[in-house]
Swiss-Prot record:
Keywords: Coiled coil, Cytadherence, Virulence. Residues 28-838, 914-1591, 1632-1723, 1777-1804 form a coiled coil. It comes from Mycoplasma genitalium (strain ATCC 33530 / DSM 19775 / NCTC 10195 / G37). It comes from the Bacteria. GO terms for biological process: adhesion of symbiont to microvasculature. This is Cytadherence high molecular weight protein 2. Component of the cytoskeleton-like structure which stabilizes the shape of the wall-less Mycoplasma. This cytoskeleton-like network of accessory proteins containing HMW proteins 1 to 5 allows the proper anchoring of cytadhesin proteins in the mycoplasmal membrane at the attachment organelle. Transmembrane segments: none annotated.
Amino acid sequence: MKPFDKKPSLQPIYDIGFDDGYLQSEYEKNRSKTDVDKIENQLLKEIKSLEDELKNLKGLKNQAEDNPELDKKINHLEVDLNRLVNEYKNFQFQKNHMVDKVSELDNLTRFYKNELTRLQQENADFLNSKYANLANFQANYHNKLNDFHRLIENQNQTINRLNQKINGNQNLIDNNVALLQNPNITVEKKNYLLNVIDQLYNELDQLENQKRLLSIEYENTYRELVSADNELQNVYENIDQNQIQFKHQYQTYRDELSQLERKIQLTKQELVDKESALRVKIDDADFYINARLAELDDVAKQLSFQDGITKQNAQHVEDKLVALNKEKDRLNTQKEAFFNLRQSALIDINKLQQENELFAKHLEHQQNEFEQKQSDSLLKLETEYKALQHKINEFKNESATKSEELLNQERELFEKRREIDTLLTQASLEYEHQRESSQLLKDKQNEVKQHFQNLEYAKKELDKERNLLDQQKKVDSEAIFQLKEKVAQERKELEELYLVKKQKQDQKENELLFFEKQLKQHQADFENELEAKQQELFEAKHALERSFIKLEDKEKDLNTKAQQIANEFSQLKTDKSKSADFELMLQNEYENLQQEKQKLFQERTYFERNAAVLSNRLQQKREELLQQKETLDQLTKSFEQERLINQREHKELVASVEKQKEILGKKLQDFSQTSLNASKNLAEREMAIKFKEKEIEATEKQLLNDVNNAEVIQADLAQLNQSLNQERSELQNAKQRIADFHNDSLKKLNEYELSLQKRLQELQTLEANQKQHSYQNQAYFEGELDKLNREKQAFLNLRKKQTMEVDAIKQRLSDKHQALNMQQAELDRKTHELNNAFLNHDADQKSLQDQLATVKETQKLIDLERSALLEKQREFAENVAGFKRHWSNKTSQLQKIYELTKKQESEQTQKETELKIAFSDLQKDYQVFELQKDQEFRQIEAKQRELDKLAEKNNQVKLELDNRFQALQNQKQDTVQAQLELEREQHQLNLEQTAFNQANESLLKQREQLTKKIQAFHYELKKRNQFLALKGKRLFAKEQDQQRKDQEINWRFKQFEKEYTDFDEAKKRELEELEKIRRSLSQSNVELERKREKLATDFTNLNKVQHNTQINRDQLNSQIRQFLLERKNFQRFSNEANAKKAFLIKRLRSFASNLKLQKEALAIQKLEFDKRDEQQKKELQQATLQLEQFKFEKQNFDIEKQRQLVAIKTQCEKLSDEKKALNQKLVELKNLSQTYLANKNKAEYSQQQLQQKYTNLLDLKENLERTKDQLDKKHRSIFARLTKFANDLRFEKKQLLKAQRIVDDKNRLLKENERNLHFLSNETERKRAVLEDQISYFEKQRKQATDAILASHKEVKKKEGELQKLLVELETRKTKLNNDFAKFSRQREEFENQRLKLLELQKTLQTQTNSNNFKTKAIQEIENSYKRGMEELNFQKKEFDKNKSRLYEYFRKMRDEIERKESQVKLVLKETQRKANLLEAQANKLNIEKNTIDFKEKELKAFKDKVDQDIDSTNKQRKELNELLNENKLLQQSLIERERAINSKDSLLNKKIETIKRQLHDKEMRVLRLVDRMKLAEQKYQTEINRLRTQTFDSEKQDIKNFFPPLFKINGNDMAFPYLYPWLYPQQKQDDNTLQIRQLFEQQLQFMQQRYENELNELRRQRNLLEKKLDQIQLESQLNNKQSEFSKVESMMEKLLEKTESRLNDFDQKINYLTKKVNQHNTYQPSSYQPTPSYQDSDKQQLLFRIQELEKQNLFQQQFQPAPAVVQQPTSFAAPNITKQQQIAQLNAEINNIKRLIAQKAASK
C-alpha cells in the first residue's frame, strides 16, 4: 500500500492526566489581555495627568498674569496632549486591526482544515472506487482472456478438421490420378474420375478459403487481446498519474497550511513588534514626564531666585535667610534621601511584581502537581485522608513510601497503556500530525488572544493607576479596595483553574472506573448474566455521586464565601471608624452561611437516607435469597450493624465539626472540607460494600437457579465473607490508630503552647532592644548632619579657591593679549622695513624718470629744430639721416632699459600686493581677535556674576558640587596644569565620598547584627510554622496564601537590602551624573564650544602670522596640541554624556523604584500614628508650595524639623520590625523550597523513565513503518516484474503468429513439411496453452498474494483497533489474538504452497527450454526473476513473521505486566483501606485537638493582620512615590522638548546656510560671465590691432596730436616710458609702431584679466572663510542655542554679499559702458579732428577712445592721489609718477576676499 492509502484514524490518544499546555495558554491569554489593558490605561493615565497639569498651569496663569514661560509650557503640554490622544487612537485602531487579522487567520485555518478533511475523505472514496474499478477491470480482463483462449482452441479445432478434410481430398485426388494413369481404364471411367477430381479440387479450394477466413478471425481476436492489454496498461498509467496528481495536490495543501503558519508567525512577530513599539512609546512618555519634572524644578528655581532678589534688599531679611538656607540645605539632603528611597522602592516594586508573576506560575505548577497527586490518590487509595496523615511525623514515612510506590506503579501502567496506544495508532500517524499542526495553530491563536487579553489587562491597570493619581486624598481606602479586588480576582482565577482541572480529573476518573468495571466483568463468568441489574446499580451509584458532587460544589461555594467574608472581616478590623458596621454586616452574612450549611447538612442526611433506603432494599432481597444460609444472614446483619455504627460516628464527627466552625473561622472551613472529603470516601466505601452485597445477592439467585452448583457458590460466598471480615478488622484497626494519634497530638499541642509562651517573652526582650537601637540610630543621624554641615563649610572654601582660579584665568588671557600686541608690533616693524625698501626702490625709479624727463626735453628741442630747418631739409638731409640713426640706437638702448625696469616693477607690484593683502588680513584678524577677546571677557564676567548669584541663592550641596565640576572642567580645558589640579581635587572628593561610604557601612554592620538576631527569632518561628503545617490538609489552602505573602515580603526584604547597599555606594555618584547631563547640555558644552571657537580663530591667525614670521611657532604648536586635546576631551565628554544620559534615565527609574520601597517603609507609621501622618502631609504640601508660602514656612519650620526627626525614629523602628517578619518568612520559604526541590527531582526522575519508554515505543513504531515500506516496495517490484513477464509473453505470441503464417504458406508448397509443421504447431499451441494457463494461474496466485498482503495490512489495522479496545475488553482480545495467530499460520502455509507451485512452474519451464531453443533466453530470465521474487517473498515472509512474533510477544508481556500491576493495585487498595480506617480513628482525635489549636490560630490571625496592615501602608507610600515619579517624568519630557527646539533651530540654520551658498554661487557665475566678456573684448582688441598695422605714419601722428592726453595710465600704474606707442616717433618705421601698439594692448588686457582673476580668487577665499565659520557655528548650534552668533555671522555674510553685488554691478557697468562706447564710436566724431582717409580715422578714433575710457576709469579710481614730481629732460612730454594709496588697497582687498569666496564656492561645487 502507498502512504496516501492510509485512512485517518478517529481513535483519540489515551489521556493519562498530564497537562498539555492548557493552563499555560490560558495564562498567556490573560497576560496578553493584562498587557493591552496596562498600555491603554497608561496612555489614558498620561492624558489625564497632562490635562490636570494644564488645569494647574492655567490656574497659575490666571493668578500670575503676563507670564510667557507659563504660556510656552501650556502650549507644549497641549501639543503633548494631542500627541498622546492620537497615539491612543492609533493604539485602538491597531488593536482592532490585529483582532480582525487574527480572526481572518482563524477562518483561513478552519477553511483549510475543512478542505484537508474533505480532500482526505475524497481521496479515500476515490481510492476505494478506483480499487473497485481496477478489480472489476481485472476480472473483465481475465474473462475476456479466457474467452479468447476458448476461441483460439475452437479455431484450432476447426483448422485441424479442415486440414484433415484437405488431406482426405488430396489423397482421393492422388488415388484418382493414379487410376487415370492406368492404361486399361475406360473412357467413361476416365471421365467419371476427372469429374470426381474436379469436385475434389473445388472442395479443396473451399476448404482452403474457410481456413483463410479462420486465420483472419484469429488475427482479429489477437488484435482485440492486444488492445485489451494496452487498455490495461493505460489504466495502470492513469492510476499512477492520479496518484502523482493527488500527491501534488496534497503537497500544495500542505504548503498552503505551512504558509498560513508562517503568516500566523509573522502576525505574532508583528504583535511583538507593536508591543515593543508601544513599550518604546511608554518609555518616551516616561522620559517626557521626567523632563517635565526637571522643567518644573527649573521654574521653581527661577521663582526662588526672584524671591531671593526681593529678600536681599533688606539686611535683616538676609540674616534670616542665611539661617533658613541652612535649614533648606538640610531639607534638600533629606529630600534627596527620600528621592533615592523612592527610586529603590520602585525598583523593588517592579521586582516584586515580576516575582509575583513567577510565584503565580510556581503556584500553578504546584497546584497541577497537587491535583495530579490528588487524582492518583482518588484512583489508588480512594480517600483523601492521606493529606492529613502526610504532615504527621509517625505516619509520614509509611504514607510517603506507599504513595510513591503507587505513583510509580500507576505511572508504569499509564506508560504501558500509552505504549500500546502509540503502537495501535501507527496507521493514523499522518492524521495525528495534521491534528497536532491544527492544535499548534490553535495554541498560537490562543497565545495571540492571550496577548491581547494581557494588553487589555495592562490598559485596565493603567486606568487604575490614573484614578489613584487623581484621588490623592483617598489613597489609603482605594489601595485597600484594589488589594481586595486583586485578591478576589486571583481567587476566582484559581477557582476556575481548579474547576477545569477537576472536570478533567472527573473525566479521567470516570474512564478509569469504566475500565475497572469492565475488568471486573471479564474476571467473573457469572457476571455476564447479571449485566442488566449491575447496570441499574451503576446508574443509581452515578446519580448519587452526581448529587453528592452538587452538594460538594455548594459547600465549596459556601466555603469560598465564608473565606472571603473572613478575609474582609480580618482586614476591616484595622479600620477603627467602620469596623463596627462591617462586623455586624459580616456576622449577619456569616449566620446566613451557617444556615445554608445546615441546609446542606439536611441535604446530606437526605442523601444518606436514600442510601439507607437502597441498602434496605438490597437487604430485603438478600434476606429473601439467603433464607437457607443462616451463616450468611448473620454475617450481613453484623456488617449492617457495623455500618450503622460507622454512620453514627460519622454524623457525630460532622456535628462536632459544624460546632467548631463558628470558632475556627477561616481555618475551620478548610477542616470542614476535609471532613466532607472523608464523608465522601465513607459513602464510596459504603457503595462498594453495597456493590459486594449485590454480588452476594446475585450469587444467591444463582444458587436458587442452579442447585447443582451450590457448593461452588458457597465457596465463593465464604471467600467474600472472609474479605468482608478482613475489611471490618482493618476498619477497627484504623479507628484505634486514629485514637492513638489524637492522644499524641494533644501532647504535642501542650508542648507547643509552652514553646510559644517562651517565644513571646523573647519577643518582648527583642522589642526593648530595638527601641534602644533606634535611639542609637537617632544619635548617629544627628552626628551625620553635623558632618554634612562641616562638608558644606569646606565646600565654601573650595568655591573661594575656584574664584581665585577664575581670576588667574583672566590674568592668563591678559598675558595672551599682551603677547599678541608684541607680535603686532613686530609685524609693524617689518612692514616699516618693507616700506623703506619700497622708498629706496622709488628713489631708483625717480632717477630713471629724471632721465626720461631729459629725453623728453631733448625731444622737444629736436622738434623745434626740425620745424626751423624745414626749408633747409635738402641741405641737411644727410645730417638728419645720421642724427636719426644716432637716436634710433639710443631708443633701442632705452627700450632695453624699459623692459628691465618693467620686469622689476612687476615683481615689486606683486610683492607689494602680497604684503598689503597680508597686512589687511592681519588687521582684520586683529580686529576679530579684539572682538572675541572682548566677548570672552564679557562672558567671563557674566559667568562670574552667575556664580555669585548662584552662591547667594542656593547653598545646596548638589549645586555646589556641580559648579565645582564645571569650574574644574573649564580649568582642565584651558591648561594641562589646571587639569591636574582638577584631578587632585576630584581625588579629595573621592576620599570624602569613601569616608561617607564607610559611615554607611557601619550602619550596615549594625543592621546585619539586627538581622542575625531577627533570623534567630525567625528560626524559632519557623519551627512553630512547620509544626502547624503538619496539622493536615484542613490548613493547606490558607498556608499557601500565607506562604505566598511571606515569599513576597521576603523577596522585598532581600531586594531592599541589595538596593540599599548599592544605593549607599552610588548615592553621590548618581546625583553628580544627573546634574552632569542637565548642566553639561546647557552650560558646559556652551563654554567648551566658545573655547573651541577662540582656539580655532587663534589657530587661523597663527597660521597667517606663521606665513610671515616664525617667532610664535612654538606657542602655536602648543596651542594646537592643547586644542586637539580639548577637542578629543570634548568629543569624549559628549559621547559619555550621551551614554550617561541613556544610562541615567534607567537609573532614574531604578531610583524611583528604590524610593518607592523606602516610602512604603516610611508609610507604615501612618497606620499607627494618624495625627502624625496628617502633619507630614501638611509638611509635604508646604514643601511643594515653598516658593509661594515661604513666609509661613519660617514660623513652622522648627516644628516640622522635630516632627521629621520623630518620623525618622519611627521609620527605623518599623524597618527593624519588618526585617524581623521578613527574615522569618525567608526561613520558612527556604524549607518549603527544599521540599519542593525534592518532589521536583522525583517527578523529573519519573518523567525521564517515561520518556525512555516512550522513545522505545517510537523506535518500535518506526521499525514497523520501515517494514511496511519495504513490503510496499517489494510488492511494487514484483508487480513490475509480472508486467514485464506479461509483455514478454505477448511478444512471444506475436512471434508465434508470424511463425504460424510462415507454416501456412509452406503447407501449400510442401506437404511433407506441412505435416511436420502441423505437428510442431500443435505441439507449440499445446505448450503455449499450458504456459498461458500457468501464467493465468500465476496471475491469480499473484493477485491472491497481493490480496493477502492487503488483507494482512487491513488485518493489522483491525488488530490495532482491537488492541485499542483492549482497554475495554481484555478477554475478547485474547481470542482475537489467537485467531490472528491462526490466520498468520494459514498465510504462512499459503506462501509455502505458492513457493512450491512456483518451483513446479520452474520445472515445466526448464522442460520447455529443451523443446524450444528460441525461448530459452526469455524463460531463463523469467526463472531468474521468479527466483528472486521467491527469495524476496521468503525473506519478507520471514521478516513479517519475526515482526509479528515480536509484537505478540510484546503484547503478551504487556498483558502480563498489566495483570501483575492490577494485582498489586488491589493489594495496595486493601492496605490503603486499612490505613483509612486508622485515619478515621485519628480524625476523632483531631476533633479534640481543635480547641487547643484555636488559641494558636488567633495569634496567627493577629500576626497576619499586622502583615496586612504593613502591606496597606506600603501601598499608600507606593502611590505617593508614583506621584513623584510622574513629576520626574515631566522634567525629562521638558529636556526632550529643549532638544527638539535645538534641532529645529539647527535645521533653520542649515537652510539659511544653503540659501547663502546659492547666492554666492550666483555671484560667482556672474563674475565668470564677466571674465568671458573680457575675453571677448580682448579678441576685439586683437582684431583692431591687426587693422592698425595697415595705417600710415602721418595719420598716426595726426591722431596722436588730436587725441592723446599728456598723462596716460593703465589701471592706476604709472608707465615707465612717456610715449606708450611707437608711432609718436616720425623717424621710426611702421612695423615697429604696430608691434609696440600690439604689445601695449596685450599688456593692458593681460593686466585687466589678471586683476579680474585676482578678484575672483579673493572672493573664493572669503567664501571659504565664511563657510568654515558657518560650519563652526553649525556645530555649536547642534549643542546650544547660539542664535546671537548666528545672526552676527549672517549679517556679516549679508554685508559681504551686498559688497560683492555692488562690486560686480560696478564691473558690469564698466564693461557695458565700454561696449556701448565701442558700438557708438562709428557715429562719434570730435570737432578738432578731421581725418583725411575715412577708414583710417574711424579705426584710430575707436581704438584711442577706448584707451581714453580705460584711462578715465583708472583716473576715477585714483582721483584722490597726488601727482608725483617731474624732472624735465630734453623731450616734449613728461609723465608724472602716481603711487597707490590705502583706500585702493582696501578696495582691492575686499574684492580679493569676494573672489576667494566665489572661487571656494566653485571648488566646492
